[in-house]
Amino acid sequence: MEALVYTFLLISTLGIIFFGIFFREPPRIVK
């Protein structure tokens, strides 16, 4: 069960980082 928690933490952290970068600089891919 610990592996599942660590995996969830890792995915959530990467998601938050990606979210921050995505909103920090505007997406240039419009098409």
Swiss-Prot record:
It comes from the Eukaryota. Signal peptide: none annotated. It holds the Pfam family PsbT. One of its GO terms (biological process) is photosynthesis. One of its GO terms (cellular component) is photosystem II reaction center. Keywords: Chloroplast, Membrane, Photosynthesis, Photosystem II, Plastid, Thylakoid, Transmembrane, Transmembrane helix. It is found in: Plastid, Chloroplast thylakoid membrane. It is a single-pass membrane protein. Belongs to the PsbT family. Found at the monomer-monomer interface of the photosystem II (PS II) dimer, plays a role in assembly and dimerization of PSII. PSII is a light-driven water plastoquinone oxidoreductase, using light energy to abstract electrons from H(2)O, generating a proton gradient subsequently used for ATP formation. PSII is composed of 1 copy each of membrane proteins PsbA, PsbB, PsbC, PsbD, PsbE, PsbF, PsbH, PsbI, PsbJ, PsbK, PsbL, PsbM, PsbT, PsbY, PsbZ, Psb30/Ycf12, at least 3 peripheral proteins of the oxygen-evolving complex and a large number of cofactors. It forms dimeric complexes. This is Photosystem II reaction center protein T.
